[in-house]
Amino acid sequence: MLQSKNNWKRNLFIIGALIPPLLVSLGMVIYPIIQTVIQSFQDPETKAWTFANYVYLFTEKVPKAAIWYTFENAVLTVFLSVSISYLLALYMRFSDSKISKLIGNMYLLPRFIPSLVAVYAMCTIVKDSGLIYRLSLLLPETSKLHGFKPGMLYNMKGIQFMNLWFNIPFATMIIVAALSGISESIIESARDIGAGKLRVFFQFILPLSYKDVLIAVTFVFMSNISSFTTPYIIGPNHPQFLGVYLRKLFSNMEYELAAAVSVVIFLFSSASAFVYLYTNMKESAWESRG
């Protein structure tokens, strides 16, 4: 009887502790999302229900180009970031060289540099009158590199470079943690029975780390599909990233269209999260059956 009473008090305390953050979530996250979805289906003049905002986004040239350009950049960033990060993580995990230790101590450094500072620093280096161009002027005029201009501003190349700068350390951190959890005895046992490096990787390392790779993919995609600072400063005027296009709509007080763009960004992010959650749920179901 006394134990039941204590359990009731404990459960009541837990519920009471959860109510404040739940109310904050409802007020600052759930409610704005619902309001945004409702507003995206409203006519700007009459406030009547309509699909015109979404029809405009997926049929007109400017918003359609923004959606495709953003998605293309996000997918390319995910592929390059995760691929490079996985190779870096493998090198740091399975190499005892001084270089791997140096990389292990330094690879998180870009995470401590504010994004705005990093983007402007990059501009001063690669712009047409930047550091690289000025250094190239020191070369003989007969050199092919004399007066070299990287041409990395206001196009996809510059955005991709900065995306890799921001995302490789983050993805590497996640994957390194996953690889560190793989027991050395598993690798040694596989090698003892004659398994080569490729077989060890595909049959042991990759299956034991792919869940964390999916986590990296999910977060890198979500952060880039809604990015604003980098494309706003060094991106082209057309096509624009969805974040930059969203800011333009707000400035023009086209709030219903802006709400529709916000919903599209949210759906892109939700899709990547769903893939990760579905994979984990499927694996959990498989393990429970086993």
Predicted feature descriptions by range:
Residues L23-K61, L139-P140, Y232-N237, E283-G290:
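Short membrane-interfacial helix/loop motifs at transmembrane-helix boundaries
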Residues I19-L26, L109, W165, T172-I175, ...:
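Transmembrane alpha-helices
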Residues L2-N7, L76-L108, Y120, T124, ...:
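Transmembrane-helix boundary motif in ABC transporter permease subunits
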Residues N7-L12, W68, M156-G158, I182-I215:
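Amphipathic cytosolic juxtamembrane alpha-helices at the membrane-cytosol interface
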Residues K5-R10, Y54-L57, K61-V62, I225, ...:
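Interhelical loop and adjacent transmembrane-helix boundary motif
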Residues V119-L164, I234-H238:
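Membrane-interfacial helix termini and adjacent extracytoplasmic/periplasmic loops
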